[in-house]
Amino acid sequence: LAAGQNHPSFGMRIKNPTPSLDDRYYVEHSNQHVGQGCLSGSENSAAIGGWRFTGLKLCRATALSESISKDLLPFLTSIQPKRMSDSYDTIIIGAGMSGLAAGIRLAHFDQRVCILERHYTIGGLNSFYRMGGRDYDVGLHAMTNYARKGTKKGPLAKLIRQLRFSWEDFKLAEQIGSSIRFPGVELDFNNDIELLESEIQKNFPTQIDGFRNLCDSLLDYSDMDGDDPRFMQSAREVVSSHITDRLLVEMLICPLMWYGNAREDDMDFGQFCIMFRACYLEGFGRPYKGVRVILKNLVKRFRGLGGELKLRSGVSKIHTDRGVATGVVLDDGTELEGKRILSSAGSIETLRLCDDVTQPEVAKAGKLSFIESISVLDRQPSDFDFDRTIVFYNDSDTFHWKRPEDQLCDARTGVICSPNNYIYDSEEGKLPDGVIRITTLANHDRWCALPENKYRAAKIEQYDASVASSVRFMPDFRRYVIDTDVFTPKTIRRFTWHDNGAVYGAPDKQLDGTTHLPNVFLCGTDQGFVGIVGAIVSGISMANRHCLVGN
């Protein structure tokens, strides 16, 4: 059939809006999209949208797959429910930051790459949505590892170089300044370590030499493969060997656990070093338009290099044969073949997908999950004398980093973030609304066990509790609130698929990204790097290490 020609029997119309893209065709029936692909097939057997049927001369889809219109079904002489198979150099599970970054890196080297995402949107936990006429960011308090334009070293410079972005593609604004607030004492810090040093000199004068010694003992990023024997040491023990004041130890470790620790109570020293550099030595930044500009740039680059992104395409199984992965099966039955698989789904979650694993060790899953209470204000936070970018607070001298077992949430400690309090360019101006975001620890199982009516009521109750806790450490903003939203561990579970809604994944990281299968690898939180920059660097590093060998 020629473009635009109607099928003489069934009224089928073929359109070709983009003939330059491999002569890819869209096919419609009764003005409903049926599928797309390259024109092919025979008089008696053809396929479109991944569905094979006989008696029609149609086209074979090679990219996006759509369900066949119900209006079309009566006209088909027969349908075989088995989906057609496509083959890729690398299949990536998850369109979060790490998956997208890995896809870009591989597509640069002309690999045929397909990213599969279960949901209707990209980003995983670091995403965004629109509600009530307002845009909301999810996950992005700040991008850690801030670096100024032209910097040659560090994770941010690495990702810009390896993904071939420019500094203007992210255009990060620096934080105004953040604080660690415990009862009776406060430490301010910004993107210059000298401020934190001066704060420690002022509040803990006997500890300043110990703090400097701690800085000198940090593992370098080049040591983050886990081979250094100090990597798995207790962070509390190592820090306490340099700093003898227990309160200062608790204060320094608080932000680092909040922004990147999957282990309860303590932290691997290697992970402590990663987060210490990310938060204290490099600092925080944010694009004016938030996480959406980061995701937009990643997707645009990936697709521009020929990568395939399939949304609403969850993976139900990883096929194995003789100890090697051969491909995946999607939730709708589509089979895709791949030479290798890179998964950001999590270590336990990935093992569960493999058809050669009967029961992964679910006890190793992470337990730490959060709720986040978002308040939209009728004024800027600076209007009521709140200029902090982020406040990490704790209401006692001991920092408790553990899932609350007997309640929905633990509001004794939390994080207050205002995206308004960054140094944006004058041409960008101020954000349209004042926003305060408050994060507290939560129990995934208790939230998920609530019936719908009690779940909605609990969101209101816990919003009130988290705000009431936070205003002990910042000016009271409750009379300025004009809109709210709350996301819970149930939300996190839905959009990340992590067991227990674990924000930072499993406590035991697989730093080399390997699994029990020689061609299935991990990237993202369970590989070891967390946060936006960490996730992107994880995707790049695992792609370089495992997927470009011999390329």
Where are these predicted regions, by residue range?
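C-terminal segments that line or cap access tunnels to active or ligand-binding sites in enzymes
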Residues: 379-487
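Mid-domain catalytic core of redox enzymes
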Residues: 31, 316-430
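Rossmann-like flavin
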Residues: 182-267
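Helical element adjacent to the flavin cofactor pocket in flavoenzyme catalytic cores
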Residues: 275-325
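A glycine-rich dinucleotide-binding beta-alpha-beta segment and adjacent secondary-structure elements
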Residues: 249-259, 415-416, 472-529
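N-terminal glycine-rich phosphate/pyrophosphate-binding loop and immediately adjacent elements
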Residues: 83-209
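A conserved FAD-binding loop/helix module that cradles the flavin
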Residues: 525-546
